């Protein structure tokens, strides 16, 4: 804290000490007097914050006021002042204190003093601080104990580096500070390595990205801890009291210092507001806090973006800037501390670049001034030379300082467009270098459309990264699919991506697939226009241009078809194949879709979704090879699959006439949706089912491929009231996630229902026979009397799901062909949803004849084909309105109540 700031704090003091001490002397209860003083401090500082006072005065001012309160509390007890000192450590030791931050104290004792002799004073002092609601963290150590613990734990050593005496013998503090900062405790090298390791672990916990949708102001990359790490190392190695001192050592420029200071003050302001508005120590920008903070800082919704998205965009941009500085300065420190004594090994790459002790470096400082294209060339060289460990700090700074050269002329320079395409075609390092280009601010300038999506959040649960971070992850996933370790999890994608004739077209499509977001309108259409223009500017051929633009425009087509449509229907496959046009388009689209889903939110990818995607790909590929002019005839398809199933049944000795008689009672949908093997197994089990009063339940896995498949539960029973409600409610109680429901009603009053389920962890059920038998028996017991089906389990709905709950929408229409009412339900996904919908149907005596279950992100789009008690579509308009209203009301109310 500067002398000027200290003087300003004294002049704007909140608590008048003489008056405060007089009030304490006169009071019967000192605790209430202390509490009132602290409340006065909180209220006054909060008012000043709301009125726009300099955040530094507030953060330092709070620590300064609390110092005075603690000193007075200390003086109420008897201490041997020459043998004890009260030390402020950590953030409080720096003189910084946010509204709800911990107040970390060290009671430092002379080695000749035993803590037991001060037990009453220590206990009374700390109890007083807790009683007056100060959030105090404390430790009591002798000088030697303190030194030994600091040697063993870098966190304790760091806390002592940032420490100051509040009251007591300051010489004790000076002595321990000298010992802890000596080479005997931690050498500069050891300390730097420990802080690097600490930061790496901290970043790993936050997915190594600044762009988490609920970032931590302290611990996420680009957060306050990254700035503090710079300060700790600077203080330990360079003796710098402030980061400003690094300017004198030529480690930081004045411009960089200004950016660092502004970034820190911004994070301080957000953290102060977060503590104040939440009323607790909170450093996570949780979704509900983001909205409150956006409103507090004056952001307003616009047509293009929500207020919360604007607020978070600013946060992300500042975080990425601070993270970039952290990288650069730690690289500087690495060179100054770890590599200072290394032999300087320099290997020229060309006239502009060289490798300096394993790191890329410009050959001379004015390289970018004389050869602006070198700003692009640097990343190509890094990709072409994977043994290079990174970029020298001085070169990172030069790249930053010369970014202004990336202008329209730069973008139109054939050397730069050629270099960028060379990077896209590089066999190694594409993902790493595109990410590095983004980090150093080059990509957003080279592709202005990409620059506009940097830091743009998507305020939902479907996307867990910002648009730019997601885009970089899609490119990374496309790269990873080439590697052998991904062959088992993604066999088709792995094979395809290694056979694509021009892999660079896939990367370009990935780069542009979401680039149109945030502008209003269809982002796929907008992105396709940008992608086509890019391809022209980079001199790609006509076919290549059209392929890339088509991929961007249709990047959602395959996932939407697989998730929302009945891909067992030959008409659906033919329509999709017509849109895709040829196998090469299909191959590119399949890989892009797989990468997109996995880079959007890894929890979205499960074994069932993998199965759907594989089936859509293989069926479409078969249709394309057969020729679009030769679509599959449904009758031919049904006849073929019946022949195959009948062949299997004959081998088992099943009477053909009995089979055909049974099949005559079943509609065509069953034979279009099921495989010959499934039809054979179902038919055999039904014909051999002797306990006709009880439901027949069969459980099988849909695939034995690793990472694919789900568990199918087939139920054959009398078609009676509440069957659907009882089934889904029982499955909910068994913690089964229903992915798909195929409901077929026979002409003889029975139902053939097939439910595709996953376990709670989104994998097929265990093949443990005891577990499967338990599930089977539970279903038989409950469905034997579906009138008395189990209650719906009340499960806790995740906090984020409640925050992003959008109103349920229900659409009803009558299908004249099937003579059924179609009920479409669009609602936020949550545990027990189908069970609740089934209960509503049951109360209205509706029978579910067919259902299509589809989860799209955090929402479901489910279709139910129902009939009334007379097996007819709902004809009463008033009943339709009442049903629509009741579904919306019950689902929305229960989402908030659970």
Q: How would you describe each model-predicted region?
A:
Residues 1-89, 95-97, 101-463:
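Non-catalytic interface/linker regions that flank or bridge core catalytic/transmembrane domains
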Residues 61-87, 233-248, 255, 464-506, ...:
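Alpha-helical phosphate/pyrophosphate-handling elements in metalloenzyme active cores
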Residues 87, 94-103, 347-362, 370, ...:
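Active-site-adjacent "gating/activation" loops or surface patches in catalytic cores
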Residues 95-121, 248, 262, 466-467, ...:
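Divalent metal-dependent catalytic cores for phosphoryl transfer on phosphate-bearing substrates
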Residues 115, 166, 181-189, 213, ...:
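Hydrophobic alpha-helical scaffolding
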Residues 134-138, 147-150, 406-417, 421-424, ...:
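Conserved catalytic alpha/beta cores of large enzymes that bind or transform nucleotide phosphates
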Residues 266-267, 306-360, 430-432, 440, ...:
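Regulatory modules associated with amino-acid/nitrogen control
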């Amino acid at each position: 804290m500067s002398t000027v700031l200290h003087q300003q704090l004294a002049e704007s003091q909140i608590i008048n000490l003489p008056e405060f001490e007089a009030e304490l002397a006169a009071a019967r209860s000192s605790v209430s007097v202390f509490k009132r003083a602290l409340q006065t401090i909180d209220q006054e500082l909060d008012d000043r914050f709301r009125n726009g006072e300099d955040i530094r005065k507030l953060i330092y001012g709070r620590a300064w006021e609390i110092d005075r309160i603690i000193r007075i509390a200390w003086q109420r007890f008897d201490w041997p002042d020459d043998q004890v000192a009260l030390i402020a450590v950590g953030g409080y030791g720096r003189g910084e204190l946010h509204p709800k931050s911990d107040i970390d104290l060290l009671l430092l004792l002379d080695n000749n003093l035993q803590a037991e002799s001060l037990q009453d004073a220590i206990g009374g002092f700390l109890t007083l601080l807790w009683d007056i609601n100060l959030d105090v963290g404390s430790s009591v150590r002798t000088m030697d104990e303190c030194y030994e613990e600091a040697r063993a734990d870098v966190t304790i050593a760091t806390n002592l580096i940032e420490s100051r005496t509040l009251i007591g013998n300051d010489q004790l503090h000076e002595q321990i500070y000298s010992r802890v900062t000596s080479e005997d405790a931690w050498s500069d090298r050891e300390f730097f390595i420990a802080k690097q390791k600490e930061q790496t672990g901290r970043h790993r916990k936050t997915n190594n990205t600044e762009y988490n949708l609920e970032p931590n102001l302290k611990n996420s990359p680009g957060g306050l801890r990254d700035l503090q790490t710079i300060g700790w190392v600077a203080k330990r190695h360079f003796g710098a009291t402030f980061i400003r001192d690094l300017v004198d050592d030529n480690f930081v420029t004045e411009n960089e210092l200004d950016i660092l200071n502004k970034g820190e003050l911004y994070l301080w302001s957000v953290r102060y507001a977060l503590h104040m508005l939440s009323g607790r120590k909170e450093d996570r920008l949780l979704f509900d806090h983001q909205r409150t903070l956006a409103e507090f800082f004056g952001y307003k919704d616009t047509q293009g973006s929500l207020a919360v998205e604007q607020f978070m965009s600013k946060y992300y941009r500042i975080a990425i800037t601070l993270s970039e500085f952290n990288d650069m300065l730690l690289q500087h420190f690495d060179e100054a501390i770890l590599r200072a004594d290394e032999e300087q090994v320099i290997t020229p790459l060309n006239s502009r670049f060289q490798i300096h002790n394993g790191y890329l470096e410009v050959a001379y400082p004015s390289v970018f001034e004389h050869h602006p294209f070198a700003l692009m060339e640097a990343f190509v060289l890094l990709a072409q030379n994977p043994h290079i460990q990174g970029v020298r700090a001085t070169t990172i700074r030069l790249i930053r300082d010369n970014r202004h050269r990336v202008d329209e002329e730069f973008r139109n320079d054939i050397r730069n467009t050629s270099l960028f395409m060379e990077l896209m075609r590089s066999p190694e390092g594409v993902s790493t270098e595109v990410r590095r280009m983004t980090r150093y601010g080059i990509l957003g300038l080279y592709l202005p459309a990409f620059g506009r999506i940097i830091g743009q959040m998507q305020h939902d649960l479907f996307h867990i990264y910002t648009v730019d971070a997601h885009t970089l992850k899609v490119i990374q996933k496309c790269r990873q699919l080439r590697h052998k370790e991904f062959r088992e999890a993604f066999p088709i994608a792995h094979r395809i991506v290694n056979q694509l004739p021009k892999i660079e077209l896939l990367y370009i499509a990935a780069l542009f697939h979401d680039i149109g977001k945030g502008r209003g309108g269809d982002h796929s259409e907008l992105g396709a226009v940008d992608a086509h223009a890019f391809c022209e500017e980079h001199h790609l051929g006509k076919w290549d241009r059209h392929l890339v633009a088509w991929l961007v425009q249709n990047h959602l087509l395959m996932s939407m078809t697989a998730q929302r449509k009945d891909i067992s229907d030959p008409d659906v496959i033919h329509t999709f194949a017509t849109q895709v046009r040829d196998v090469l388009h299909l191959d590119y689209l399949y890989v892009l879709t797989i990468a997109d889903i996995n880079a959007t939110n890894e929890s979205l990818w499960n074994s069932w979704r993998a199965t759907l995607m594989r089936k859509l790909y293989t069926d479409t590929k078969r249709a394309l090879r057969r020729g679009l002019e030769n679509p599959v005839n449904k009758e031919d398809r049904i006849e073929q699959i019946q022949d195959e199933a009948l062949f299997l049944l004959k081998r088992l000795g099943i009477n053909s006439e009995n089979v055909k008689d049974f099949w005559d009672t079943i509609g065509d949908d069953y034979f279009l949706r099921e495989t010959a093997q499934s039809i054979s197994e179902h038919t055999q089990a039904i014909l051999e089912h002797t306990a006709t009063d009880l439901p027949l339940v069969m459980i099988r896995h849909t695939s034995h491929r690793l990472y694919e498949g789900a568990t199918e539960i087939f139920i054959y029973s009398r078609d009676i009231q509440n069957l659907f409600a009882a089934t889904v409610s029982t499955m909910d109680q068994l913690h089964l996630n229903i992915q798909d429901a195929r409901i077929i009603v026979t002409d003889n009053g029975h139902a053939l229902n097939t439910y595709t389920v996953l376990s709670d962890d989104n994998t097929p059920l265990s093949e443990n026979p005891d577990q499967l038998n338990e599930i089977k028996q539970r279903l038989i017991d409950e469905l034997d009397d579906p009138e008395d089906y189990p209650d719906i389990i009340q499960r806790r709905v995740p906090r984020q799901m409640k925050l992003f709950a959008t109103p349920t929408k229900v659409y009803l229409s009558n299908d004249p062909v099937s003579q059924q009412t179609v009920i479409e339900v669009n609602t936020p996904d949550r545990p027990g949803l189908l069970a609740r919908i089934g209960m509503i149907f049951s109360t209205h005596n509706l029978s579910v004849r067919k259902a299509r279950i589809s989860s799209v992100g955090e929402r479901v789009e489910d279709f139910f084909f129902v009939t009334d008690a007379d097996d007819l579509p709902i004809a009463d308009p008033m009943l339709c309105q009442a049903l629509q209203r009741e579904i919306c009301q019950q689902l929305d109310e229960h989402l908030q109540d659970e």
